[in-house]
Swiss-Prot record:
Associated with nonmuscle myosin II heavy chain. Interacts with PRKCI/aPKC, PARD6B/Par-6 and PARD6A. Interacts with STX4A. Interacts with RAB10 (GDP-bound form); the interaction is direct and promotes RAB10 association with membranes and activation through competition with the Rab inhibitor GDI1. Interacts with DCAF1. SUPFAM superfamilies: WD40 repeat-like. PROSITE patterns: WD_REPEATS_1, WD_REPEATS_2. This is Lethal(2) giant larvae protein homolog 1. Widely expressed. Expressed in brain, ovary, testis, with moderate expression in lever, uterus, lung and kidney. The modification Phosphoserine is found at residues 662, 964, 982, 989. One of its GO terms (biological process) is axonogenesis.
């Protein structure tokens, strides 16, 4: 009989169809700067740029929103990239000497990047494949000549030619070193080889001429038309780079000793022995090699010479520089990361006599910098994308959806005022190829990232291009040691070389205590809370004009009811006193300092009540920032916690107290052993007795030995860590009167619910009266399995989460149902459970797994709108586990809806950094500099929809290899397979359709701390959980 009672019901076809209309998993776009870039290319005709990485990724960028991404099948480093100008095709060279031809193909109204042909030379041609010539070894350099020929320079000094249409070797056109040596005088040979081919350059006016540079220093002009050597330049210095002059009458070469030379090609056919100009810009002392050099002509006659490297080896050998020389002006662009490559945006039309460069683009290991070469001072051009997310290491992130247009405009205005003076370049972004087919988003989304240097950056996450808007810095409020070091460094800086700091990547943090741990933003009042590593909690407010004011400071001792503790960790940050100047933007109004100054692990803001709650590893506090007074401080450390004794939080207890607690444990174990099946009431009484005993003051009186607290991270298993905080207007005292409440969840499975007495605001007033806020402990819930509480949310009478502050009062969301019974959803690392309020009795639950290994890491309530009906939407619970799986559950029934594999379980940092949005999307870090964006919603999808204005070939590069799948992760993750991409119908369908404004609101759920991933199989189980929650009611 029981098997029929518990038999699972069959799938409802109607519900399954509805699921397909609500849920769909896509990895859509990668935001940020490519991780570990290794190659760069630019198409001057289409105005698109390509970046290759060490993991084999290929990323092509055009105008904002125009992006194409591909991944080589072999995880090898991309060493060189070359566009076929105007054709939408890209040739890549990997470090295994293989060539790959990529094409941008039009399909279903959208453009896609696909890999076409490939060429793999054998590692040992004489043994592996007799059809390949013996000299075809490692490829060192590639050139596209005359548009239809690929020229390969090799390590052996041989040069080979391939047909670009088939990537097949052209017979009888190989140029061997012996043939070149015949044109070289005998005294130059000296029995030595020419060395590898270092550079191949095509002539702009005559594509049949190829400039060849060998490592030993020999330069050769080879005529492909006549198959002969036209000119020889006998260089003696080891060659690094070559560049033609505009008209082809001059050649510039750079060398390993930090010098460059200019050679004239008008000296006739005999070998040229000496260059016309030889100079070492930073000599006479030994210098590093000039890795790459460019010569760009101007109509004014003052030509540009741009090169990387060449710095004095002893003094500045560790600098990463690109030097720009024009006439008598020399500027040394000083970067904080290694220079990968650079190019200029200039005229390439054959009829133009001069280059007239407009911009210089420098690809660095950690960022992309574009300089305006037409404006005096050569200022930087603001980048609409590819901004380095990791300019300082990311420590936390948050997403804010549906940002009001007024707040958006104020944030953008504050960001524009942060531009350096004089104003930035008037030149617009020069990489403008392609067309973005996606419509303008109907709502604005902000991505907030907290960083190690104490900054919070605001990003426009509304579309494909993640655009920087504004940067908030908190370091100016505090006294740090770096202030004196910076002034000293500026004082001793020499005038030569003329260094100029460029770029925003700064890997060094001034003070690790400045690191941002949590952020919270109220989008209706423009108030913000920022919490840091040293226990600092800042309350800020957006101002449109600069101001000068003092910041109020208040200390909140979270251990005020525990005597004899000594903090052995870092000191708190000392704030500056007196009037301080603040730029336009978010300006601090209140500084709350937690004591001990441990890292803040949870924070929440309720602007309507002017309250902020914060938690650390020692407890949590509630602060009224309107009256600038603390309301509550609660310590969550348990004296009997063995983990707290053994972990970094070490406390020495007296022998008398230890013996007393040991006898109590023995007595409790005897009682529990005799009574195997106690009644529920006796269990509750015993639990209450234990709770009363833990909080009994007489246990804390006799402490003859001082207890010492050491710093510890927020991701350990100590029970006192506060994991989440939550405000709600709900029923806690009784079922007829609702009011403000605050909820706190800890690492030990404890949930504290406080009833708040908040003075009500007058009719039409924004601020509440200046009366004190009171907090009374109402409920205390101890989960039996003691798993860490990840998130808490209150559901109204219709089972929907409560709206955010000001949402209902301003008619921006449907008012909550305050007539029916409320419920509270408590999400722990092991299970989800819904309790009725105010009795706090279990209503429904879902146990994520019955086995060890699967734990909840991130939780959020999101609204999923139907693709078929604009009026239908469901609020569901999205959950990410430590195995990288995403589960979606119905609310409040907690029935599983869909399950997707999202992140590799080995990617611990990616799982820890995941952030869900309120419309069913998410972000997580796939590298220190890149966010992967994914969507769980079938309606709300943000992905590249773009095209290129080129003539699409009917049968391009046939035969074609297997079509490349849509890239899931360009950092080399290959074990996650996505559904095929589709662009059928209007490209705006995924962006323009949104649910109505009156939609179920999202409850603010706190993020969880980082934890280590464990292996294990996921098992979804809704039965077999017989745990009992202990509830203590303090309100009666």
């Amino acid at each position: 009989m029981m098997k029929f009672r518990f038999r699972r019901q069959g799938a409802d076809p109607q519900r399954e169809k509805l699921k397909q209309e609500l849920f769909a998993f896509h990895k859509t776009v990668e935001h940020g700067f490519p991780n570990q870039p290794s190659a760069l290319a630019f198409d001057p005709e289409l105005r698109i740029m390509a970046i290759g990485t060490r993991s084999g990724a290929v990323k092509i960028y055009g105008a904002p929103g125009v992006e194409f991404t591909g991944l080589h099948r072999d995880a090898a480093t991309v060493t060189q990239m070359h566009f076929l100008p105007g054709q939408g095709r890209l040739l890549t060279l990997l470090d295994d000497s293989s060539l790959h031809l990529w094409e941008i193909i039009q399909r279903n109204g959208c453009a896609h990047l696909e890999e076409g042909l490939s060429f793999h030379p054998p590692s040992r041609p004489s043994f592996d494949n007799a059809s390949f010539p013996a000299g075809l070894t490692r490829v060192t350099v590639v050139l596209l000549a005359a548009g239809d020929t690929v020229v390969l320079g090799t390590e052996s000094g041989s040069i080979f030619f391939l047909d670009v249409a088939t990537l097949a070797l052209l017979e009888g056109q190989t140029l061997s070193p012996d043939e070149v040596l015949r044109s070289v005088p005998d005294d130059y040979r000296c029995g030595k080889a020419l060395g590898p081919v270092e550079s191949l350059q095509g002539h702009l006016q005559d594509p049949s001429k190829i400039l060849i540079g060998y490592s030993r220093g020999l330069l050769v002009i080879w005529s492909q038309a006549t198959q002969s050597v036209e000119h020889v330049f006998l260089g003696n210095q080891q060659l690094e780079s070559l560049c033609w002059g505009r008209g082809g009458s001059n050649i510039i070469s750079s060398h390993s000793d930090g010098s460059y030379a200019i050679w004239s090609t008008d000296t006739g056919s005999p070998p040229t022995l000496q260059p016309t100009v030889v100079t070492t810009p930073y000599g006479p002392f030994p210098c590093k090699a000039i890795n790459k050099i460019l010569w760009r002509s101007c109509e004014s006659g003052d030509h540009f010479i741009i090169f990387s490297g060449g710095m004095p080896r002893a003094s500045y050998g560790d600098r990463h520089c690109v030097c720009v020389l024009r006439a008598e002006t020399l500027v040394t662009l000083d970067f904080t990361s290694r220079v990968i490559d650079f190019f200029t945006v200039h005229s390439t039309q054959p009829e133009d006599e001069c280059d007239n460069p407009q911009a210089l683009a420098v690809l660095l290991e950690e960022e992309l910098v574009v300089l305006d070469l037409q404006t005096p001072g050569w200022p930087a051009v603001p980048a609409p994308y590819l901004a380095p997310l990791h300019s300082s290491a990311i420590t936390c992130s948050a997403h804010v959806a549906n940002v009001p247009s007024k707040l958006w405009a104020r944030i953008v205005s504050a960001g524009e005022q942060q531009s350096p003076q004089p104003a930035s370049s008037a030149l617009s972004w020069p990489i403008t190829g392609g067309r973005n087919l996606a419509q303008e988003p109907s709502q604005r989304g902000l991505l907030l990232t907290g960083h190690e240097d104490g900054t919070v950056r605001f990003w426009d996450a509304s579309g494909v291009a993640l655009r920087p808007l504004y940067k908030l810095s908190t370091a100016g409020l505090f006294q740090t040691d770096c202030e004196h070091a910076d002034s000293l460094a500026q004082a001793v800086e020499d005038d030569w070389p003329p260094f100029r700091k460029v770029g925003c990547f700064d890997p060094y943090s001034d003070d690790p205590r400045l690191g941002i741990q949590k952020v919270a933003l109220c989008k209706y009042t423009a108030q913000m809370v920022v919490a840091g590593t040293a226990g600092q909690v800042l309350v800020l407010e957006l101002s449109e004009v600069p101001a000068e004011h003092a910041v109020s400071v208040a200390n909140v001792d979270l251990l005020q009811d525990r005597e004899g503790f000594t903090w052995k960790g870092h000191e708190r940050l000392n704030p500056h006193t007196g009037l301080l100047p603040w730029p336009a933007g978010f300006q601090p109004r209140m500084l709350i300092q937690c004591l001990p100054p441990a890292a803040v692990t949870a924070v929440t803001l309720h602007a309507e009540w002017s309250l902020v709650a914060f938690g650390t590893s020692h407890g949590f506090g509630l602060f009224d920032y309107q009256r600038k007074s603390p309301v509550l401080a609660r310590c969550t450390l348990h004296p009997n916690d063995s983990l707290a004794m053994e972990g970094p939080l070490s406390r020495v207890k007296s022998l008398k107290k230890s013996l007393r607690q040991s006898f109590r444990r023995i007595r409790k174990s005897r009682v529990s052993g005799k009574k195997r099946t106690p009644a529920a009431s006796s269990k509750l009484q015993e639990a209450n007795a234990q709770l009363a005993e833990q909080t009994c003051p007489h246990d804390l009186e006799m402490t003859p030995v001082q207890r010492r607290i050491e710093p510890r991270s927020a991701d350990d298993s100590l029970s006192g860590v506060v994991r989440c905080l939550y405000f709600a207007d709900t029923f806690l005292r009784d079922a007829t009167h609702h009011g403000p409440t605050m909820w706190a969840g800890t690492n030990s499975g404890s949930v504290f619910a406080y009833a708040l007495e908040v003075p009500a605001a007058t009719a039409g007033g924004e601020k509440r009266p200046e009366q004190a806020v009171e907090a009374v402990l109402g409920k205390e819930v101890q989960l039996m399995h003691r798993a860490p509480v990840v998130a808490i949310a209150v559901l109204d009478g219709r089972g929907r989460p409560l709206p955010e502050p000001y949402e209902a009062s301003r008619d921006l969301a449907q008012a909550p149902d305050m007539q029916g019974g409320h419920a509270v959803l408590i999400a722990s690392e092991e299970q989800f459970k819904v309790f009725t309020l105010p009795k706090v009795s279990a209503k429904t639950k879902f146990k994520l797994t019955a086995h060890e290994g699967c734990r909840v890491r991130k939780v959020a309530l999101a609204t999923f709108a139907s693709v078929m009906s604009e009026d239908y939407a469901e609020t569901c619970l999205a959950c990410l586990t430590n195995l990288g799986d995403v589960h979606v559950f119905a609310v409040p029934g907690l029935r599983p809806q869909v399950h997707y594999s999202c992140i590799r379980k080995e990617d611990i940092s990616g799982i820890a950094s995941c952030v869900f949005t309120r419309h069913g999307q998410g972000f997580y870090l796939i590298s220190p500099s890149e966010f992967e964006r994914f969507s769980l919603s079938a309606r709300n999808i943000t992905e590249p929809l773009c095209s290129l204005d080129i003539s699409w070939p009917q049968n391009a590069t046939q035969p074609r290899l297997q079509e490349s799948p849509k890239l899931s992760q360009a950092n080399g993750t290959r074990d996650i397979i996505l559904a095929p991409e589709s662009c059928e119908g209007s490209p705006s369908s995924a962006h323009s359709k949104r649910a109505d404004t009156m939609e179920p609101p999202e409850a603010a759920l706190s993020p969880v701390s980082i934890d280590s991933a464990a292996s294990g199989d996921t098992m979804l189980d809704t039965t077999g959980d017989v745990t009992v929650e202990y509830v203590k009611d303090f309100l009666g």
